[in-house]
């Protein structure tokens, strides 16, 4: 892969409408007939880049990876699992001002994949920068998840930690939480705010999970640190919303 050379596209706005597809970038045919398409997206000074595809379809065996030019940050593989009826997909952040898009297509499905990039967001703030939280920085209503509030809390707190998500809609961030339904079906519903998104935002939203605090003791006298910025999911459907209560129910 290091020997492959792609085309470089340069953007400069914070959120930019683009028109990039397989006619851009570069194809490389492998010895077994499989092929790889690559394109390098450059946005000078960007802390991160994230992407919206308005035509996304991965055939069986096809996969898409996004990674920084220095290979320190990686998203993927995006596969047929991420195919949606809308044909759209939004990604999480890739850190760096240069990001490679790399699509792999097996010989038996040549020409079946579709990939069209319609929007690129130039990130100018780093959500990872302030990982250290000062003592007494939280509000009174914020409960330390590692402090027990009942006999059964120890069994529940890890589930609560894992349910919290950051929600990325193009160039804005919100928070949300996984909730269950009354039939305990395990359907992945996210509860977030109505002001965060509409139906089109939900289609291209990306979700970050894995907010598990490395500090597991209650009320320590040292600063706390956020968990890893990993484990992302892309694509969802707006199931219900209510502006009066500022509620949105999302199915991921």
Task: Locate the predicted segments by residue.
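Extended extracellular/luminal ectodomain segments enriched in beta-structured repeat modules
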Residues: 44-50
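Extracellular beta-rich ligand/substrate-recognition surface
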Residues: 24-33, 169
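Beta-sandwich interaction modules
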Residues: 76-96, 106-109
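Short beta-strands within extracellular/lumenal beta-sheet-rich domains
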Residues: 32-41
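Single conserved hydrophobic/aromatic residue that forms the stacking wall/gate
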Residues: 1-6, 11, 250-251
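Extended, low-complexity, turn-rich repeat/linker tracts enriched in Gly/Pro/Ser/Thr and Asp/Glu
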Residues: 56-62, 198-199
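Short, surface-exposed beta-strand/strand-loop-strand elements in extracellular ectodomains
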Residues: 59-72
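Serine endopeptidase catalytic core focused on the charge-relay Asp
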Residues: 94-250
